[in-house]
UniProtKB/Swiss-Prot annotation:
Subcellular location: Mitochondrion membrane
Modification N-acetylalanine occurs at: 2
CDD domains named among the record's database cross-references: Bcl-2_like (cd06845)
Function noted in UniProt: Promotes cell survival. Blocks dexamethasone-induced apoptosis. Mediates survival of postmitotic Sertoli cells by suppressing death-promoting activity of BAX.
Organism placement in taxonomy: Eukaryota, Metazoa, Chordata, Craniata, Vertebrata
Gene that produces this protein: Bcl2l2
Family: Belongs to the Bcl-2 family.
Coiled-coil regions listed in the entry: none
Gene induction: By Igf1.
Main location: mitochondrion
BH4 (motif): residue ranges: 9-29
Protein name: Bcl-2-like protein 2
Record remark on domains: The BH4 motif seems to be involved in the anti-apoptotic function.
Length: 193
């Protein structure tokens, strides 16, 4: 049941983050979500957490979207498989950030492979996943206000220490997600023969 977790506009949060990441990679021009500094403290916190995540896990995560060999026909299935694998051990804020980074990476890979229409679809899938599968956890964990307190500007040192624990298992989950994606690709290849 999705209610309080989506009190801040989930679609605006996703659009801002994806736009921000696409602009970092030089893919999007002109005004739109993700351009310039975020006025909303939640958007600022998600951008900062995403940047930190990418810095910490660059080697593990860098080519995940490319390794999935996404096509317009397989994109939603791959998105769901990786997202489900990511949260298999239960949600936490670190995994939620990884979900945002993965979604943005999938959007960037779509643009890179000239499949721009997938960008809007991936954002829709992200919003739906957040609002149907993660909303209750977000709400029970203090909502987006708690996320902003943990990851936003001026966060207490204690919050940073707690956050370190959330990042610890993300590398293992991402490695598993890459392996799952590779197995699905190999399985699909052999099934088509």
């Amino acid at each position: 049941m999705a209610t309080p977790a989506s009190t801040p506009d989930t679609r605006a949060l996703v659009a801002d983050f994806v736009g921000y990441k696409l602009r970092q990679k030089g893919y999007v021009c002109g005004a739109g979500p993700g351009e310039g500094p975020a006025a909303d403290p939640l958007h600022q916190a998600m951008r900062a957490a995403g940047d930190e995540f990418e810095t910490r896990f660059r080697r593990t995560f860098s080519d995940l979207a490319a390794q999935l060999h996404v096509t317009p026909g397989s994109a939603q299935q791959r998105f769901t498989q990786v997202s489900d694998e990511l949260f298999q051990g239960g949600p936490n804020w670190g995994r939620l950030v990884a979900f945002f980074v993965f979604g943005a990476a999938l959007c960037a890979e779509s643009v890179n492979k000239e499949m721009e229409p997938l960008v809007g679809q991936v954002q829709d899938w992200m919003v739906a996943y957040l609002e149907t599968r993660l909303a209750d956890w977000i709400h029970s964990s203090g909502g987006w206000a708690e996320f902003t307190a943990l990851y936003g500007d001026g966060a207490l040192e204690e919050a940073r220490r707690l956050r370190e624990g959330n990042w610890a298992s993300v590398r293992t989950v991402l490695t598993g997600a890459v392996a799952l994606g590779a197995l699905v690709t190999v399985g699909a290849f052999f099934a088509s023969k």
